[in-house]
Amino acid sequence: TMARTLTSFGVKLTAIEFDKRTIVEIVDNLVHMIEIDFDRRYDLMSDFGSSVITDQDGILTTCFAEHSFLLSLLKAKDQGKRFKVFVPETRPYLQGARLTAPSLVELGIETALVTDGMAGHLMANKIVNRYMTAADAVAMDGSIANKIGTLTNAVCALHFQIPYHAFAVSPD
């Protein structure tokens, strides 16, 4: 992602002589421009994310679903929507238990930590009606790759006709 971002900003620092101060200034300015661009993208994605969340939703996620997902939930909460997020523990590193669930609790969002194998049960019993994740990689055709368990949950969502929204900054 960083290489792609730097390329998109047209950064080529090869074979040009710079003094140390100039390089620091260039890098500082570049980082600032990238931060502004990412903030804009996250804000736009979270506008979409909050718009698809409806009152009383049960939302399933996987792993740590990016800033745009958290912003989506925060915006939906600020709009007065009530919902609950079901967070699988995400083994083997427990990103759901260690990152996502505590972040949601800190934001004051109703959260339930569940085992990785519960997604199908939650969908079949209409406890969850929306699936939202990040995407670790996005192909040019729009297909995504994400953490282990995402495919199984996506297949369950398709079977139970539950919308699946994957958040990503851009194709890889």
Task: Give the residues covered by each predicted segment.
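Conserved phosphate- and dinucleotide-binding cores of soluble alpha/beta proteins
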Residues: 90-172
